[in-house]
Amino acid sequence: MAAEHPFKNILTTLPKPGGGEYGKFYSLPALNDPRIDKLPYSIRILLESAIRNCDNFQVNQNDVEKIIDWENTSPKLAEIPFKPARVLLQDFTGVPAVVDLAAMRDAMAKLGSDANKINPLVPVDLVIDHSVQVDVARSPNAVQSNMELEFKRNNERFGFLKWGSTAFHNMLVVPPGSGIVHQVNLEYLGRVVFNTDGIMYPDSVVGTDSHTTMIDGLGVAGWGVGGIEAEATMLGQPMSMVLPGVVGFKLTGKLQNGVTATDLVLTVTQMLRKHGVVGKFVEFYGEGMGKLSLADRATIANMSPEYGATMGFFPVDHVTLDYLKLTGRSDETVAMIEAYLRANKMFVDYNEPQTERVYSSYLELDLNEVEPCISGPKRPHDRVLLKEMKSDWHSCLDNRVGFKGFAVPKEQQDKVVKFDFHGQPAELKHGSVVIAAITSCTNTSNPSVMLGAALVAKKACELGLEVKPWVKTSLAPGSGVVTKYLLQSGLQEYLNKQGFHVVGYGCTTCIGNSGDLDESVSAAISENDVVAAAVLSGNRNFEGRVHPLTRANYLASPPLVVAYALAGTVDIDFEKEPIGVGKDGKEVFFRDIWPSTEEIAEVVQSSVLPDMFKSTYEAITKGNPMWNQLTVPEASLYSWDPNSTYIHEPPYFKDMTMSPPGPHGVKNAYCLLNFGDSITTDHISPAGSIHKDSPAAKYLLERGVDRKDFNSYGSRRGNDEVMARGTFANIRIVNKFLNGEVGPKTVHVPTGEKLYVFDAALKYKSEGHDTIVLAGAEYGSGSSRDWAAKGPMLLGVKAVIAKSFERIHRSNLVGMGIIPLCFKAGEDADSLGLTGHERYTIDLPTNVSEIRPGQDITVTTDNGKSFTCTLRFDTEVELAYFNHGGILPYVIRNLAQN
């Protein structure tokens, strides 16, 4: 007989007004504990989950007490389990996840167990949005042409995902062309409150995309995790996490006329980066909340990874309920959501007196003080006020190469490169805009900035301004709803006239899917070493990400993207210099094309309608003709095609037995790479184009794949052979072994040969040598890319020694059995005199019971140096994963035994 639920005494019925009941719920007020009223709303969601899932095995009563006592336990970095309500995937991360699930089924069968035990136990939603590329732009047929090319390139991947949606229960696949995962999540998938088998509970989600945090704007707790962790969550494993501190961020006042949500989010990002919020939740509150639309909140929540927080959370209030109605959720559903959240102390009513909540630290921003700004040229938190942009650009040209520098000699700063663009004279200078993209989940779901951009285009058309034809302009909305309201407003035609045709519904320029520049433009840039610029309404602008030829990349609001496209350069002072000359020969200034807040609000009010959301999402599950024509087998085990260059059986479980291998130390390892600070997951495992001379290109060419069909690294994440070769393959990666030379090569220490990283790793492996990686601060920042851990593991990397790790990447390394070590405060490779030419031994006990989370570990080198590091296995559960050789073997053995 099943044991009684430890908290069954607080299971309470929620009555419906007018009779009947909505269901039952675990009532926080019924605990009669005064500490709950002081808890941040985001922590209450963790508390409810712990109570509901308490079985005194995966989650115990002590965990519940830790969360109730959050004020005292969070500073001690207490560990808690968390079981999210659902999992969200996109196709770049979803394909390798489904590949792993399929391989796990094979492993279960080989161990003599039931393969069907490998099945998601919570709802899994997979939105295909990362495969569209901007091959065709500035054309009314762009959407159809790009989609046809997308299907041609990705036929096999899409077929595999369609197989997954039938082979696994509880998995919804949203077909390509439907929109960006986070916007679809916000407008359609987000439940806010679940009612399953008569039990009600708050929606919560983990996603294999770091911008999953966008859903926090809807009052749903959600954040990005590695694909490896997401797979374990699907299979019923609790996530182990440190109970986070919560930064209370008070908003007062309201935004000034002409200031956008993007200006606000870039300001908030800079403030929070400065405050230091890594590993923490940020919870927004204050009277300024009522002035923030839900789309504005979602924009701020979306950029949590850029300010470093786990979440940027906006509790549910009346604004949330209005948005749920606007997006087509039924009145009955919204009434149920409100009733549950009010009854369980999770609803904020600003008309009632507020109980003062306790936060770990506090920040405050008067919205009235936010000014127009952009961020760049190489990092999202390097904010530049619009009025200071020209002088900032000139100092970037002067400064030595770095996050704010290009080191262009003074005498070359004003050079003009003239070239022929399809028969017409064209010119480029340093700072010329060659890509202007309204793109990414951050902004394309926000009607005020999207319609604002369209109004800028309209005013420019009326004044006779035109974007130069050599600027690659594009518009990639987050969902079909955007197209509907742009058409309803009559403004899409003006965006089209300026070259901003819709190119597709998905992630494009922001993740490097910007497509090629015109050959004449590419040649002008590379032959003359021009520092060309991209301006995009995205959330990431790390070097080499947007496009290999745009060395300066600025994040800006959609209306500013249009303004910079019209100006054709970032080297401009919008207050003093004209953007261009109008049809009557008069100079046109920024202020002439910039819409007022009232103008924008009026268009939003008349153009964004509930029926648009309903009709868009009713069509989603029906798919589209190209998707519906894909035929897939109906077997529960996948039949791998050994010749496939997209889907390949991974080697992780090949020789697996029922006995865990135990912890591995590291003996006399060579250093594969020696890095400085801010190495992103993009540097480790790029998502964009496959360089023609790279080991991955060589592999594909040997298998008969033409260069034009290489597709991107992101689209080939279902093939470990390609991805291992693509590890550390970013063309902008800086490795100290190369003394200033940039690119994906390293030195094979024993011979001194300079080789591609993959070839060097292969050489070490064939010689029987382990390898490690040395790194600086913020190692693994950026996207939640599990291949940034899988790739190094396949290359034979046994440990990474860094000054600090980004949260998701550290847990991914643990998940793949790689040891993360941190230098002691104030120390790093340079201060310890390490060049990377040494051999490294990491002394670890061979019995896992003798290892403690966070303990000191001694590292010795062959030249007699030794130093102490902190072992970054942060929890007992992570040590168990390490003992099993990673999280997935741990799950397989557990399921096979039960």
UniProtKB/Swiss-Prot annotation:
What keywords is this UniProt entry annotated with? 4Fe-4S, Cytoplasm, Glyoxylate bypass, Iron, Iron-sulfur, Lyase, Metal-binding
Its GO biological process annotations read:
citrate metabolic process; glyoxylate cycle; tricarboxylic acid cycle
Q: Which GO terms describe its molecular function?
A: 4 iron, 4 sulfur cluster binding; aconitate hydratase activity; iron-responsive element binding; metal ion binding
- PANTHER family this protein is in? ACONITASE/IRON-RESPONSIVE ELEMENT FAMILY MEMBER
Q: In which pathway does it act?
A: Carbohydrate metabolism; glyoxylate and dicarboxylate metabolism
The EC number of this protein is 4.2.1.3
**Protein family (similarity comment):** Belongs to the aconitase/IPM isomerase family.
Reaction catalysed by this enzyme:
citrate = D-threo-isocitrate
**Function text:** Catalyzes the isomerization of citrate to isocitrate via cis-aconitate.
Query: Where, subcellularly, is it found?
Result: Cytoplasm
Protein's name in the database: Putative aconitate hydratase, cytoplasmic
Q: How is the cofactor bound?
A: Binds 1 [4Fe-4S] cluster per subunit.
| Domain of life (superkingdom) | Eukaryota
Q: Which organism is it from?
A: Oryza sativa subsp. japonica (Rice)
- Binding-site positions, [4Fe-4S] cluster: C441, C507, C510
Q: Where does substrate bind?
A: Q90, D209, S210, H211, R540, R545, R703, S784, R785
What cofactor is this protein dependent on?
Answer: [4Fe-4S] cluster
Instruction: Give any Gene Ontology cellular component.
Output: mitochondrion
Chief site of localization: cytoplasm
